[in-house]
UniProtKB/Swiss-Prot annotation:
Component of the cytochrome c oxidase, the last enzyme in the mitochondrial electron transport chain which drives oxidative phosphorylation. The respiratory chain contains 3 multisubunit complexes succinate dehydrogenase (complex II, CII), ubiquinol-cytochrome c oxidoreductase (cytochrome b-c1 complex, complex III, CIII) and cytochrome c oxidase (complex IV, CIV), that cooperate to transfer electrons derived from NADH and succinate to molecular oxygen, creating an electrochemical gradient over the inner membrane that drives transmembrane transport and the ATP synthase. This is Cytochrome c oxidase subunit 6A2, mitochondrial. Belongs to the cytochrome c oxidase subunit 6A family. Heart specific isoform. It is found in: Mitochondrion inner membrane. It comes from the Eukaryota. GO terms for cellular component: mitochondrial inner membrane. Component of the cytochrome c oxidase (complex IV, CIV), a multisubunit enzyme composed of 14 subunits. The complex is composed of a catalytic core of 3 subunits MT-CO1, MT-CO2 and MT-CO3, encoded in the mitochondrial DNA, and 11 supernumerary subunits COX4I, COX5A, COX5B, COX6A, COX6B, COX6C, COX7A, COX7B, COX7C, COX8 and NDUFA4, which are encoded in the nuclear genome. Pathway: Energy metabolism; oxidative phosphorylation. It is a single-pass membrane protein. Keywords: Membrane, Mitochondrion, Mitochondrion inner membrane, Oxidoreductase, Transmembrane, Transmembrane helix. The keyword Oxidoreductase applies.
Protein backbone atom coordinates (compact mmCIF):
# COMPACT_ATOMS: atom_id res chain seq x y z
CA UNK A 1 0.00 0.00 0.00
CA UNK A 2 1.48 3.30 -1.10
CA UNK A 3 -0.67 5.49 1.20
CA UNK A 4 0.65 8.98 0.40
CA UNK A 5 1.31 8.11 -3.25
CA UNK A 6 -2.31 7.13 -3.75
CA UNK A 7 -1.48 4.18 -6.02
CA UNK A 8 -3.38 1.41 -4.25
CA UNK A 9 -4.13 0.46 -0.68
CA UNK A 10 -6.06 1.88 2.29
CA UNK A 11 -4.80 5.44 2.69
CA UNK A 12 -3.77 5.57 -0.97
CA UNK A 13 -7.35 5.01 -2.04
CA UNK A 14 -8.50 8.08 -0.12
CA UNK A 15 -5.61 10.25 -1.32
CA UNK A 16 -5.66 9.49 -4.83
CA UNK A 17 -8.89 8.41 -5.23
CA UNK A 18 -8.03 5.19 -6.53
CA UNK A 19 -10.04 2.37 -4.94
CA UNK A 20 -7.80 -0.53 -5.87
Amino acid sequence: ASGAKGDHGGAGASTXXLLT
